[in-house]
Amino acid sequence: MPRSADIGIYFHVHMISDSTGETLMEVMRASVAQFQNVRPIEHLYALVRSPRQLERALEHIQAYPGIVMFTLVNAELRRDLEDACASMGMPALAVLDPIQATMSSYLGAPVQGKAGAQRVLDADYYRRIE
């Protein structure tokens, strides 16, 4: 019997960020919108900047298997996350990597690797809002 059009396919999606996670949420939602009757169960882990914070997220991922999307600049945390996901059989996607690699190649400039770099509140920011 065919699946009813109003029944959704539910799946867990885990988003791990060393900043607010806003970028991950937007990318994930834009991607999910391309699939009919797909309903993500969203798990956001924001401001993950220590091994202990990552460990807590990984415990949750193990309890609720699903797709893992991340934006982490810390190489050690990235490696730990990728290794853990591989051992659990979970797909892990570094969302910004292809974009940053392309821009770096085109511009001939290295990626700075600063967590939350787009949301820096500096003197220029405060001058603009005055």
What does each model-found stretch correspond to?
Residues 1-7, 50-53, 119-130:
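Short N-terminal or domain-adjacent regulatory/targeting segments
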Residues 1-3, 7, 38-39, 78, ...:
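Non-catalytic terminal and connector segments of soluble metabolic enzymes
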Residues 1-31:
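N-terminal accessory targeting/assembly segments
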Residues 9-12, 38-40, 61-67:
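Short, surface-exposed connector motifs at secondary-structure boundaries
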Residues 14, 86-130:
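Ser/Thr/Gly-rich flexible loops in soluble cytosolic domains mediating phosphotransfer, phosphorylation
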Residues 19-20, 35, 49-50:
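N-terminal loops that bind phosphate or other acidic moieties
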Residues 30-39:
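Short helix-loop-beta junction
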Residues 44-85:
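Metallocofactor- and cofactor-centric catalytic cores in central/energy metabolism, strongly enriched
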